């Protein structure tokens, strides 16, 4: 929702699918793009100055990304555990928004924030041509690790990115206890 700073107007709200869940924050760019990741889609919602829009003609979009199984602890749901992070500003050619996906062994996924370059071809293994690229995260874990998952936003500097793995080998079965134990 967007709320008038003087609290004189009714909040402007966008509702997603009844089967979707949003458990993270949103990011906002300098052109009124609002980036929200549900457990199924990464979205750009646009504030037009008078309303929130999910219409492509206003620059809005949605893209599927990879999901997985319910992890043993820390993260709720099967989608992303990260608030979208913006990457690329000013005169930088590539304006991206990045998240970690919900795959059991997560990927870092970069989506084109604005228009997809005309010569861009969808990367093999991605769910949409909105995905500029995605990379598997190993976090130094052995190849047979069942889980590599994060509940934090991706940290970026320029076009570099840093993520953490919040799943350990011996997790408590109780998610609350696991969150307390791991911080």
Feature roles, as predicted:
Residues 1-23, 27-183:
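Extracytoplasmic/lumenal domain signature
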